[in-house]
Curated annotation (Swiss-Prot):
GO molecular function: acetate-CoA ligase activity; AMP binding; ATP binding; metal ion binding
Listed cofactors: Mg(2+)
EC primary class: ligase
Keyword check for Hydrolase: no
Keyword hit for Membrane: no
Function per UniProt: Catalyzes the conversion of acetate into acetyl-CoA (AcCoA), an essential intermediate at the junction of anabolic and catabolic pathways. AcsA undergoes a two-step reaction. In the first half reaction, AcsA combines acetate with ATP to form acetyl-adenylate (AcAMP) intermediate. In the second half reaction, it can then transfer the acetyl group from AcAMP to the sulfhydryl group of CoA, forming the product AcCoA.
Reported modifications of this chain: Acetylated. Deacetylation by the SIR2-homolog deacetylase activates the enzyme. The N-terminus is blocked.
Name of the protein: Acetyl-coenzyme A synthetase
Biological-process GO terms, alphabetical: acetyl-CoA biosynthetic process from acetate
Binding site residues for CoA: R217, R218, G219, K220, T335, R613
Binding positions (Mg(2+)): V566, H568, I571
Pfam families linked: ACAS_N, AMP-binding, AMP-binding_C
Originating species: Methanothrix soehngenii (Methanosaeta concilii)
Length: 672
């Protein structure tokens, strides 16, 4: 269980409480049959620690990436240099090569032994609509027809296209068609407003928008095309809107600008030659939703995002040819780009893709999907786990989840008690959980267990092979075990971001400037997250660098107090903020959502405070606990502490257009 540590990092003065002593060793059979163990045996490594250190070492890490690039990707033209850092921080990977990512994801499978293998099992939200199974052969034909349609509109290598679609197969088809032509795609989450789409399309100069007439949400058709119309009105670069007919919603079509998807592909050839590009060619731009500040247009390169995500997915989740993989993210986020579209297809895997809400028509929908389609590996977010915790184990208990063999977590740190619930009720008390830490900027996992790794609840364990990740204090020194600081990448890696679209100064300032002039630290990437390593070297992510409470001289991570609150048997979710205090600087105020079947009361508030005091110590205990029905969250499910704090303190909440549930803001009580 969590023990009191109360240690303090003298440089950052961050008080660290977590000391997780529960360890879950992987089953022997999983270890012995794992992909990474086979590779270790081939290389002669005796231990996981030795292997991870070798792969990330100065002497061998480029050798490692050279092997991975040649293992996972077919190169049209071989590269002549693995990595060129002469223009730091603009790193160039696989110099001199030529590649097409759609060829690697689709063509080579469709022309080989996997032509008839299912690439996607697509489940529509309406229960009266049929499930679709799309083979690699099917995908090849549909991607090529749509790519030829895009060519007929004059789209070409270097152009940019915005994609504004729900979770339907035409979304990855559109992405793959763009990539086949060397066109950069900008996927905009379908839950964003017309302004969100307009801002992104205008900012990056999109020549076209690909969208749908409407989509289904909780059983009802929701129009989407009108948002694209409004966005195009404020984005002068947009020449065409391509509309896929999904929900049968009546929409207006502007002559000369708008074209139906089915008309565009009609009569198009099922063959389309790939456009071979430099590995540094921009594959996509993805705008962060962000918990602070304005969105950033993050540019990702083709070569690195063919190699990194495929290799990490293969090793971390140990995917075999007969697995059925389900990443529950929306493709509008980086998780969907890397782990629903590119990596699973490059590996030739079968993925499940679900259109709708997790709780429609009830909280059993996900578990029914797993039961019906024999999903073997599930990758989801702590937000979803806590939502199901709140409803109780009776929902998953109704279904046969015995096909599952591995679980994963993504999107934010998972608090230890949610981790335990996930393992106990979804994983039958025996499945390992691959808790991955990474970012939109990184393109792929940086820290994660492997199937051979002993686990600690709430820990993303160690840096993955080939990723030199560390924790530094503000002077650039590595912090000792048991301490906290800034999590950084000491070396570049293939899938990392290449730039901010149109903002070189911000790119430099945000990620590289902090340690640039520190001797020996030039080129160190500042992730913007803080973390601690326990006495065994396990990493625990504590949230963003600016998510820190200052209480009586102690710097306390918001996430740590929230984890302690959620460990309370009656609390499902929590957000904590600092309230100005004349004596202590700040006092801690908590906003909590109760699990189903519990009622707010002054006694429960006192009990929650006492629970945190016992778990973390008096300095970390909230002085107030407020019960709320909901907490404002981004579309990717992250709690917007900035908004919670602004509302609670009576300050302007700022732009909340990207919130999933803006109505939750009004439910936050003022505390001053």
């Amino acid at each position: 269980m969590l023990k009191l540590a109360g240690k303090e990092d003298k440089k950052l003065k961050t008080t660290v409480f977590q000391d997780e002593t529960r360890i879950f060793n992987p089953p022997k059979e999983l270890v012995e049959k794992s992909i990474v163990m086979q590779w270790m045996k081939k290389k002669g490594f005796k231990t996981e620690k030795e292997m991870r250190a070798w792969c990330s070492s100065d002497e061998h890490y480029l050798e490692f990436w050279d092997e991975m690039a040649k293992t996972y990707v077919d190169w049209h033209k071989p590269y002549t240099k693995v990595m060129d850092d002469s223009e730091m921080p603009y790193f160039h990977w696989f110099t001199g090569g030529e590649i097409n990512i759609t060829y690697n994801a689709v063509d080579r499978h469709a022309k080989g032994a996997k032509k008839d293998k299912v690439a996607y099992i697509w489940i529509p939200e309406p229960t009266d609509q049929p499930v679709q199974k799309i083979t690699y052969g099917d995908l090849y034909k549909e991607v090529n027809k749509f790519a030829n349609g895009l060519k007929s509109l004059g789209l070409k290598k270097g152009d940019r296209v915005s994609i504004y679609m729900p979770m339907i197969p035409q979304l990855p088809i559109a992405m793959l068609a763009c990539a086949k032509l060397g066109v950069s795609h900008i996927v905009v989450f379908s839950g964003f407003s017309s302004k969100g789409l307009m801002d992104r399309a205008a900012h990056c100069g999109s020549r076209a928008i690909i969208t749908v007439d409407g989509f289904y949400r909780r059983g009802k058709p929701v129009p989407l095309k009108p948002n694209a119309d409004e966005a195009a009105g404020g984005a002068p670069s947009v020449e065409k809107i391509i509309v896929y007919k999904r929900a049968g919603v009546d929409v207006s079509m502007k002559e000369g600008r708008d074209v139906w998807w089915h008309d565009l592909v009609k009569g198009q050839s099922e063959e389309c030659e790939p456009v071979w590009v430099d590995p540094e060619h921009r594959l996509y731009i993805l705008y962060t939703s962000g918990t602070t500040g304005k969105p950033k247009g993050i540019e990702h390169a083709t070569g690195g995002n063919a190699v990194g995500p495929a290799q990490t997915l293969h090793w971390v989740f140990d995917l075999k040819d007969d697995d059925v993989w389900w990443c529950t993210a929306d493709i509008g986020w980086v998780t969907g780009h890397s782990y629903i579209v590119y990596a699973p297809l490059i590996l030739g895997m079968t993925s499940l893709m679900y259109e709708g809400a997790a709780d429609y028509p009830d909280f059993g929908r996900w578990w029914k999907n797993i039961q019906d389609h024999k999903v073997t590996v599930l990758y989801t977010a702590p937000t979803a786990v806590r939502m199901f915790m709140k409803q109780g184990a009776e929902w998953p208990d109704k279904y046969d989840l015995s096909s599952l063999r591995l679980l994963g977590s993504v999107g934010e740190p998972i608090n230890p008690e949610a981790w335990m619930w996930y393992r106990e009720h979804i994983g039958r008390g025996e499945l390992q959980i691959m808790d991955t830490w990474w970012q939109t900027e990184t393109g792929t996992f940086l820290n994660s267990p492997l199937p051979i790794t002993p686990l600690k609840p709430g820990s993303c364990t160690f840096p993955l092979p080939g990723y030199d990740i560390s924790i530094l204090d503000e002077e650039g020194n590595e912090v000792p075990l048991g301490s906290g600081g800034n999590i950084v990448a000491l070396k570049p890696y293939p899938s990392m971001l290449r730039a901010f679209w149109g903002d070189k100064e911000r790119f430099m300032k945000e990620y590289w400037q902090f340690y640039w002039d520190v001797p020996g630290r030039r080129g160190v990437y500042l992730a913007g997250d803080k973390a601690q390593r326990d006495k065994d070297g396990y990493f625990f992510i504590q949230g963003r660098i600016d998510d820190v409470l200052s209480v009586a001289g102690h710097r306390i991570a918001n996430a740590e107090v929230e984890s302690a609150l959620v460990a309370h048997p009656k609390i499902a979710e929590a957000a904590v903020v600092g309230k100005p205090d004349e004596v202590k600087g700040e006092s801690i105020v908590a906003f909590v959502i109760l699990r189903v079947g519990n009622e707010p009361s002054p006694e429960l508030a006192k009990d929650a405070i006492a629970f945190v005091r016992k778990t973390l110590g008096p300095v970390a205990a909230p002085t107030e606990v407020h019960f709320v029905n909901d907490l404002p969250k981004t579309r990717s499910g992250k709690i917007m502490r900035r908004v919670v704090k602004a509302r609670a303190l009576g300050n302007p909440v700022g732009d909340i257009s990207t919130l999933m549930n803006p109505e939750a803001v009004d439910g936050i009580p003022k505390i001053v």
